[in-house]
């Protein structure tokens, strides 16, 4: 669910997910679509594509559990769809951390109507 995703992002980046990424660029947060503005926005684009592959669970509401051991996210989930969802969230959290140096405050609250035609997954 969005709760686990937010926790992972905080653990990996040290940033609070909603204010930092909830409205970032064209692909982060609700209703995001369009050509990614930068590497951080591309992380969110790839994450949305990952979610599109999920067929038996709802990323917004279904809950899974994970472990945080030695600063590493471990998706220890038995349900195949929830495990895949956890892996999607883990991947975006790591991607956001790896691209912290390109995080651009001008994209933090980006007007979605400025976003051009979306890339395809």
Swiss-Prot record:
Region of interest called Important for membrane-damaging activities in eukaryotes and bacteria, as start-end residue ranges on this chain: 105-117
Residue numbers marked as site, Important residue of the cationic membrane-docking site (MDoS): 105, 108
Localization: Secreted
Keywords linked to the UniProt accession: Antibiotic, Antimicrobial, Disulfide bond, Myotoxin, Secreted, Toxin
Record site: Cationic membrane-docking site (MDoS): 112, 117
Primary location group: secreted
Domain of life assignment: Eukaryota
One Pfam family, short name: Phospholip_A2_1
Biological processes, Gene Ontology terms: arachidonate secretion; defense response to bacterium; lipid catabolic process; negative regulation of T cell proliferation; phospholipid metabolic process
CDD domains named among the record's database cross-references: PLA2c (cd00125)
GO CC entries: extracellular region
Alphabetized InterPro entries for the sequence: PLipase_A2, PLipase_A2_Asp_AS, PLipase_A2_dom, PLipase_A2_dom_sf, PLipase_A2_His_AS
SS bond partners: 26-115, 28-44, 43-95, 49-121, 50-88, 57-81, 75-86
SMART domains, alphabetized: PA2c
Site for Hydrophobic membrane-disruption site (MDiS), residues: 114
Family: Belongs to the phospholipase A2 family. Group II subfamily. K49 sub-subfamily.
Subunit (UniProt): Homodimer; non-covalently-linked.
Annotated function: Snake venom phospholipase A2 (PLA2) that lacks enzymatic inactivity. It shows antibacterial activity against both Gram-negative and Gram-positive bacteria, including methicillin-resistant strains. In vivo, it causes local muscular damage, but no systemic damage (intravenous administration does not elevate plasma creatine kinase). Also causes an inflammatory activity that is demonstrated by mice paw edema induction and pro-inflammatory cytokine IL-6 elevation. A model of myotoxic mechanism has been proposed: an apo Lys49-PLA2 is activated by the entrance of a hydrophobic molecule (e.g.
Protein name per UniProt: Basic phospholipase A2 CoaTx-II
High-level lineage: Eukaryota, Metazoa, Chordata, Craniata, Vertebrata
């Amino acid at each position: 669910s969005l709760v686990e995703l937010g926790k992972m992002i905080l653990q990996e980046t040290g940033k609070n997910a909603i204010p930092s990424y909830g409205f970032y660029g064209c692909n982060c947060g609700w209703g995001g679509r369009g050509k990614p503005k930068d590497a951080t926005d591309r992380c969110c684009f790839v994450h949305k594509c990952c979610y599109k592959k999920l067929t038996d669970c709802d990323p917004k509401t279904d809950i899974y559990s994970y472990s945080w051991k030695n600063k590493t996210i471990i998706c220890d989930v038995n349900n195949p769809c929830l495990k895949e969802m956890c892996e999607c969230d883990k991947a975006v959290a790591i991607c956001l951390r790896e691209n912290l140096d390109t995080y651009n405050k001008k994209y933090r609250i980006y007007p979605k109507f400025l976003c051009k035609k979306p890339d395809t997954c």
